[in-house]
Amino acid sequence: PRTRANIERFGLGHHIKGHRLVLLPPQGYLEMVGLLAGARIVLTDSGGLQEETTALGVPCLTLRENTERPITVEQGTNTMVGRDTGAIRSEAAEILAGRGKHGRVPELWDGHAAERIASDLAEWLVGQHQSRAST
């Protein structure tokens, strides 16, 4: 909603028409993941999308100067481009030409977090029980 409002506020709508860009209303999580999975490139300032694009293997340009998700830059598909329009255009062109960054899904993003948590909790609980039994 903010992006659409700013496009209208600054009279930039004419830059979007005819450039295969579509402004969508807010999406639910599953709908957004479906859109991301089919994307050739994602430009965002959202931390969550940096993670989702890395998990999906989709190149992501983050239009910020910093990130709370550095693993998406270090190992994933995310590239920080800030607000420098030259860097944004250059990186986007590289990605669209097939020469962009090819990251990987971080090791612990394997879908088994719940199993590891349950195992660690069980181990901790057994330790707590044994500790109480010996006192």
Q: What do these predicted ranges mean?
A:
Residues 3-135:
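Nucleotide-activated sugar donor-binding and catalytic core shared by glycosyltransferases
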